[in-house]
């Protein structure tokens, strides 16, 4: 297992971040993942990192803070936190987040407090988030197990067995087998995603129509100059990186006011430390006018109330139902993995790279091209075995994009 973990750490730094010699790496990790964070730091130095800067998190202390701290703690942006994120982002440092959290860390926390905390955090990270969404620096999110998360995924196993099983599952999603060829497999995978992306870009769809047996009946208009993206992103300096390990998606941005109908989530969503189930949105002219859920509805409504843009959509992503992650049969209770098992949408901020020349546009120019703006970006999964997506071109042709949950192009 140690060799597999070293290979995974190297994959993250070399393919995920494409770390350059002399570049600073900001590594954000839960304290429970310290052993793996150390492997990532060593891999970074092996590739010539100038410095590795650690930013530790802890679910227990996070929950204690949300339950017991005074209101001012969630309402006052801190200059030192703003400086930490802004200074390194402006320097072009690479950013790695090891994604591992208890899906129910913040269960029972007041939704109003969650919204206040997100607004304050967004104020502290404004420059960082803007540059990240525009691929201003290499960034990558990759997972590692912690006990509470593993127990949720494998509730019938002992804690140790659950953690081991989650490690095995994670390594399979990122194509790490221990043979030393994970990087080569990823180059092939990125080439496949790129080919599909180029086919979609050549078709220049005007809109997409989603239907399935859950009740989804949604039409999504796309900006005239939209671009599909997949797998490999690129900084303004031309440095390629893979923002999510794993990734199976091809994505673009919708026209902000061009979505109408009903969409139903196919999988639970973990958001702000709570689980939300059976999401159902009613959408008119791009805006979510009604949000329902069988569990966590208060958390869901808080999430779409962060700002006005949170009630509009920022991402349309295509993932085949027979993707390796969905085929594993596991529900990860973690968006990094579950979004790569299913077609998904996101409410909130759109990625500038999804419009021609978007990374160089001002906020006003992005608005004029129909891209949504928000402090938040939350993916939720809509793909099912019977999902049908029909694309309409600008000359009126209707083409099957998805049939029975998989690509039909």
Question: What feature does the model see in each segment?
Answer:
Residues 258-260, 276-278, 285-288, 311-315, ...:
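Active-site lining segments that contact anionic ligands and/or coordinate catalytic metals
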Residues 250-308:
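Long, well-ordered mid-to-C-terminal structural blocks that present hydrophobic/aromatic surfaces
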Residues 290-359:
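Dual-mode signal for accessory low-complexity, basic/Gly-rich regions
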Residues 364-409:
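Extended hydrophobic packing segments that form well-structured cores
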Residues 10, 201-203, 272-274, 309, ...:
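Short solvent-exposed loop/turn micro-motifs enriched in small/polar/acidic residues
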Residues 107-110, 150-155, 231-233, 274-277, ...:
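A short secondary-structure junction signal
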Residues 1-260, 391, 397-400, 407-409:
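Active-site bordering "gate/hinge" segments
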């Amino acid at each position: 297992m140690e060799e597999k973990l070293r290979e995974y750490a190297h994959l993250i730094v070399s393919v995920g971040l494409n770390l350059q010699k002399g570049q600073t790496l900001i590594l954000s990790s839960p304290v429970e993942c310290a052993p793996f964070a150390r492997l990532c730091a060593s891999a970074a130095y092996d590739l010539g990192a100038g410095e590795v800067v650690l930013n530790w998190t802890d679910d227990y202390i996070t929950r204690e803070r949300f339950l017991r701290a005074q209101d001012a703690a969630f309402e006052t942006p801190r200059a030192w936190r703003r400086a930490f994120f802004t200074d390194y982002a402006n320097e072009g440092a690479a950013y790695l987040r090891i994604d591992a959290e208890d899906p129910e860390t913040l269960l029972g926390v007041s939704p109003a407090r969650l919204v206040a905390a997100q607004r304050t955090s967004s104020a502290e990270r404004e420059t960082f988030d803007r540059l990240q969404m525009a691929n201003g620096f290499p960034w990558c999110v990759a997972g590692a197990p912690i006990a509470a998360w593993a127990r949720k995924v494998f509730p019938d196993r002992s804690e140790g067995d659950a953690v081991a099983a989650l490690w095995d599952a994670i390594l399979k999603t990122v194509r790490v087998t221990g043979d030393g060829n994970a990087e080569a497999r990823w180059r092939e995978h990125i080439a496949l995603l790129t080919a599909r992306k180029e086919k979609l870009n050549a078709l220049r769809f005007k809109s997409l129509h989603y239907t399935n047996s859950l009740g989804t009946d949604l039409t999504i208009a796309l900006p005239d100059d939209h671009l599909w993206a997949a797998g490999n992103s690129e900084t303004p300096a031309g440095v390629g990186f893979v923002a999510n390990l794993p990734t199976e998606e091809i994505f673009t941005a919708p026209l902000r006011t061009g979505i109408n109908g009903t969409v139903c989530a196919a999988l639970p969503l973990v958001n702000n430390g709570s689980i939300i189930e059976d999401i159902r949105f009613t959408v008119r002219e791009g805006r979510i006018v009604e949000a329902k859920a069988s569990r966590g509805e208060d958390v869901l409504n808080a999430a779409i109330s962060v700002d006005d843009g949170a009630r509009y959509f920022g991402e349309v992503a295509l993932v085949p139902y027979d993707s390796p992650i969905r085929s594993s049969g596991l529900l990860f209770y973690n968006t990094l993995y579950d979004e790569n098992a299913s077609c998904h949408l996101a409410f909130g901020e759109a990625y500038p790279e999804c419009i021609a020349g978007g990374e160089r546009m001002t906020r006003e120019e992005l608005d004029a091209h129909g891209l949504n703006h928000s402090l938040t970006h939350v993916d939720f999964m809509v793909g099912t075995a019977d999902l049908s997506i029909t694309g309409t071109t600008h000359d009126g042709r209707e083409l099957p994009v998805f049939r029975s949950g998989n690509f039909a192009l």
